[in-house]
Structure formats: C-alpha cells, structure tokens
Amino acid sequence: MESALRFFALTGLLMASTTTARDVPQNVRDLYNSIRSQGSCKNQLKGGFYSQEGDSKNFGYCGDHLADYKIMYLQGKNGELVNMDIDCDGALGEGDGSCDSSGDTQPQTTFQETVAGYNKGIKDLNAYIHSFVVLGNDGSKNGYIEFKPEQYGIEPLSTVAVVCGDKMFYGVWGDTNGDDGPPLIGEVSDSLGRACYGSAVNGNAAHDENDVLYIAFAGSDAVPGANGAKWNAKSFSEFESSLGSLGDKLVQRIAGGGGGGGSPGDPPASDCSWEGHCLGDKCSKDGDCDGELVCKAKKCAVDA
C-alpha cells in the first residue's frame, strides 16, 4: 500500500513538472503585490460572494484597474485574493480520472454553442485539455447574487491570466457559476488547476488558500476567436501555449509591461475621454458615463 501511495504521489509530481509554466512577469508580480498590500478593492463591481462555501462572503469582482489597464480581477478583504475550485463541466471524454470524484459536473459549459460554432472539430471545452476560468454568476433563486462580466467589457471566451503558486498560465473565460449552490467565485478547469497545484487538486479537492490572482481582460481584442487558439488541441500544454502570443500582448497593458511605444510604468491609454466617468466608475444615471456607456447598478457599464 505504501509503495502504491508513493507511485501516485510521484505520478502527480511528474504530471506537474511536464507542464511548462510561465514565469510571472515583473509588472504582473508588482500588480499582485499591490493588490494584496492595498487590502481590499476600492471600486468593487459586485461583492457578496464566497471564495469557498461557508466562508466570510467578503469576495467580489474588482474594477480598480478597469479604466487604465482594462482588466478586472477577483479580490477579497484584508489582503486576500480568492481560492481555486475545480470545474469538470463540458465534454470530458477520456482523461486521467481526476474529475471522477466531482459531484457537480454539468454536461456542457456556458459558451458551448460558440465553441462548436468555431468548427474546429470539438463540440465543447474539455476540462482535461482546455485551460478555462469560471467567471460570472447566473441564477434565478431568491437571494442568489448575479454578476455579468459582459457589462464591464469582458467577452465570452476571452483571455484570462491566472497567477498561482508563483507561476502564470493563460486560459479563456469558458464557464459561469450557477445557482445550484451558493454564489461562489474562483474556479478553473481541472487541467488548469492541476497545472497550478498538481495532484493536490481534483474534481473534489480545491486549493483553499485565497492567494490566486485571476486577471480578465476587457475588449474584443482579448478574444482569440476561432483561429487565435488551438481549440482542437490534444493536451493542456498544446492549448495553453497557443494563447501565449495574445496573452503576452494583453499583459503589457498592465503598468510596467512596456510595449506599444509607451514608457515602461505608464498605464496604457484608455478609450475613455471623460476621466472619472469611465467603465467601472460610479454613476447615478446614464448621463454620468462617457460615450456609449450606461449606468447599471451605480457603475458605468457596457450596454449589453
């Protein structure tokens, strides 16, 4: 029995080591540290979520850098970010069995029709292969807290950067949280979770520490589309690496990323011409927001 346990432990370590992680760029590392040192979000787009069932419900979607870097991220209070739960939804097919223990598997992901419409030989995302992140909360049950990232420019199947365990991976926004449980945030596909934390996570085991940074990028330029990613990839590494070029470009939006002709450390130019009335800023009526933005839930948002 002891030798068997050693075998499975070694297998988990080998699996984690064969996945090539990205180094965390200095500008992303600086952002990570500044978010945690700030303690809590100043421009919370929506709060009242759990990082895991039964915790403080002090977690939410943050828009502190929605106007300057065009990013949204998840954050708690007192320096906490969020945890990493494991999603096994979608077209699993054959895998390593790490999703077998999941008691909450849905047969399709939220954007299944779009994925199938890419005509790349797959019907849906596969949690064993595709690196995807769960964002947004949809439900109709009484008291369930909803949030739609689209209202803040985050588009379906757009690129998301995940900083976990002092490494970084790229994924896409591929699923949403439903009201079959409490309003939760902080979840990724099984393959992405295991790339981050190896065999310590599976369909029934999460990474519980609130130290994971999820960075979603607003705008249509963050969407790889049918031909910008290897949707018919046969492995996690093949799919994740196909997002590298676009992901690296998007990360340069963050102060210190350089590129685009700006000086390192300067935030990228925003499309908003009315400072203080941009995407994610506070408002009381539509006229308080720049351009075609509208006022929703007292925040300037895209009219979706």
Regions found by a protein language model. Name each.
Residues 202-211:
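Intrinsically disordered, low-complexity linker and terminal regions at domain boundaries
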Residues 190-196, 209:
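Aromatic sugar-binding interfaces of carbohydrate-active proteins
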Residues 179-192:
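Short, solvent-exposed secondary-structure boundary/capping segments
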Residues 22-167, 171, 177-180, 197-200, ...:
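Cell wall/extracellular polymer interaction/catalysis modules
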Residues 264-304:
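Secreted, cysteine-rich disulfide-bonded mini-domains of extracellular proteins
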Residues 215-221, 299-304:
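Short beta-strand-to-coil "C-cap" segments at the C-terminal boundary of structured domains/repeats
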Residues 1-22:
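Fungal secretory targeting signals
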Residues 257-264:
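Intrinsically disordered, low-complexity regions enriched in glycine and serine
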